[in-house]
Amino acid sequence: MAPSKELDTVLEMIRVRSAEVRKTTDDDRLSYERIMSVLPMDDDIETERVGVNGTPAEWISAPESQENRVILYLHGGGYLFGSARTHRVMLAHMARASKARVLALDYRLAPEIPFPAPVEDSVSAYRWLLDQGISAKKMVIGGDSAGGGLAV
């Protein structure tokens, strides 16, 4: 039996990670970006970079996404790593399954920016969505790892 396409993708991610020498936080961030860029994304997914009260973010939507349904997603990465880009493929699946648009926030990261900056960025993004006319009743806030902590 031949390896699956999914296994081939995981093996490629390991190969990319293993080939890199990492010395700094920036090196680790770049490595994570490269690893996650190996994951394939469906061709019908749309992404749009936006500024959210000065914080970069990315809208991710599928053809099924309804304009008034929104997920504010806060990525994981120990407050050191991660971005809309590293989570894009997973969030594309989330947008399709939920029929919602996903706003992935690139909150400020440590160690350059101390805590509570990620909390401030997250609250600011929530308020920005309300100002854009998104009803709190049609919004979900979620995240993984550090982003899950921010969502709470």
PLM features per residue range, with description:
Residues 1-65:
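A glycine/proline-hinged amphipathic helix-loop "lid/cap" segment
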Residues 44, 54, 99, 136-138:
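A generic structural signal for alpha->beta connector loops
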Residues 57, 72, 94, 115-152:
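Short strand-loop-helix active-site module centered on a catalytic nucleophile
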Residues 68-78:
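Short beta-strand element of the alpha/beta-hydrolase
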Residues 83-85, 114-115:
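Conserved catalytic-core motifs of eukaryotic protein kinase domains, centered on the activation segment
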Residues 85-105:
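Short amphipathic alpha-helix adjacent to the substrate-entry channel of hydrolases
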Residues 106-110:
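Short beta-to-alpha linker loops that shape the active-site pocket of alpha/beta-hydrolase fold enzymes
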